[in-house]
């Protein structure tokens, strides 16, 4: 396990069994470093796949802060209020500060309310803070990627390309068809990037989280 600062400078190295995933090594590496140097107020930043729900809980219980990339598939849940009141409309640079369930779904973020809830640790113990940002540049890149994936799926469905079942292809009774519903859902989320954190807004505004 390798712990680095924001500039990539190595801070600590740890050795683990070769079959141990990063999700199982990051907590002991971080907590050992914090204990060794008597660090308080440390913020762990990681990609979406680096930390599990259990990891986030353990970091929080250890008194550590975190900012973790969120999977775009979480957007429909986190942004349910936005989609209900504003549809698919986003502006370049728009930021939405809201909540995300720690597990599954909960009622902390009520889509019936137009205003996004402000995360409070003591009040929303079933949720984390979620910050979502929209970028027109990212949307254009996502659109190109989805178009390529859709074209690949259409080629497989038409029998023009032999391959294992790609994204946006569904198989029913041995027949392959284009999964138009999944493609439409993916198109709806173009340009969005999310972050999950346990840092209150009064400590770190959304712009700094991003």
Language-model features and meaning:
Residues 1-210:
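Anion-binding and metal-coordination hotspots
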